[in-house]
Swiss-Prot record:
Biological process (GO), any one: tRNA wobble uridine modification
Domain called TrmE-type G: residue spans: 214-359
Name of the featured protein: tRNA modification GTPase MnmE
Compartments where located: Cytoplasm
Organism encoding this protein: Ureaplasma parvum serovar 3 (strain ATCC 700970)
HAMAP family registered for this protein in UniProt: GTPase_MnmE (MF_00379)
Taxonomic placement: Bacteria, Bacillati, Mycoplasmatota, Mycoplasmoidales, Mycoplasmoidaceae
Domain of life of the native organism: Bacteria
Amino acid sequence: MSTIVALATAPMNCAIHIIRVSGPKAFEIINKISTIKIKKETFKIWYTILKDDNQILDEVLINTFVAPKTFTGEDLVEINCHGGIVVANLIIKTLIKYGCQPAQRGEFSRRALLNKKMDLSKIEAINNLVNAKNELSVKGVIGALLGRVSQSIAEFRHELFMIIGQIEVNIDYPEYDDVEQVDAIILKQRLLSLDKKITKIIDQSKKFLPINKGIRVLIIGKPNVGKSTLLNALCNEQKAIVTDIPGTTRDVIESSINIDNITLNILDTAGIHLTNDFVENLGINKAKALIDKVDLILYLIPANEQQDLELYDLIKKQKHLLVYTKKDLVDQYDDKQIYINAKNNDIQSLIDEIKKLFYVQEFDNANIDVLQSQRQIGILENVHYLINNAILNLEKGDTLDLIVADLEFCNLRLNELLGISSEYDFLDDLFKNFCIGK
């Protein structure tokens, strides 16, 4: 295995940079440029000056970590140098000169996975923590980072192992009287109980995913209903030109904001109506094409007008809110509807409805143990499907080997979630609890 090096901090001028070196020759290589002997001792901080021949590179602090008790599971050295990017690059260039290889993207985390320092769920959580868009996203990542999500998946696997093991024993040793026979009713109950737990984490994860990645919001309506005014109010700055002339917005304007601990990725669009203007029609077609590609649609209607049923037909199957703008135009309000005056920044009622629609309060007041990506959710949904297929086959009276085939594939998918080997000897685990051939 090669010894790798990379800048662990952002590639820009700052107060301090951290350069990470990992691999079997980490200490050997660092000692080629250190003016003092960096001993192979763990959890130590060393002050030294780095030199290449007679050229002084920098005055640094070096943190040392000895395998296997490191992030990567390998010998690990972290150099804390001054924050000039030129200085950091010079040190990295020198380390490469003396034997380091430039690290590939994510290679330190990959080595941590290969050396079983953490599972794939935790690895993905680290990346999500770095890219967290708001405090609620951080809260959702922490559950995975601390291993609570991995523990849940491990419990699913263990229960699955026990079920598969019992079935395998019945298939392979039918002649033994002391082997507990598979009871179809009990087996179905165990599978239903397992599926209930899996469904719960799928449902929670689906709810949380838009919050984690940012809620994609499409603002639509007829021309001059206040779409761009709402965008500017949400962003608290003029992102879009606002005039009294219908059709001012002709293209999609996108902006990302954090507001009340949620991230909104907002798309302001051209007003949807019949027009002979070629350019405006392009913008209208873009708006229509986005309808099924967002998490939420805000359909804006002036408070003194009725909704356009033809336009509503385009969005009614998607998650949406009807928002009545220019509330100052009416004297009475329907308590069941949302009224705003974006020109005066009177939009809190809309923000509150968005938070309610995406369960923000629910997540804000509880520990969040959720999957971190659509990929992970998709895998667990496949497990849910396979378990239900096994239950269906059980109810039809199919043979045990057909039922166990679905469950064994469930095991492969759960292993995929954790990034571990899919090889597992079920009988070895089961022999601890079964008395075979005594």
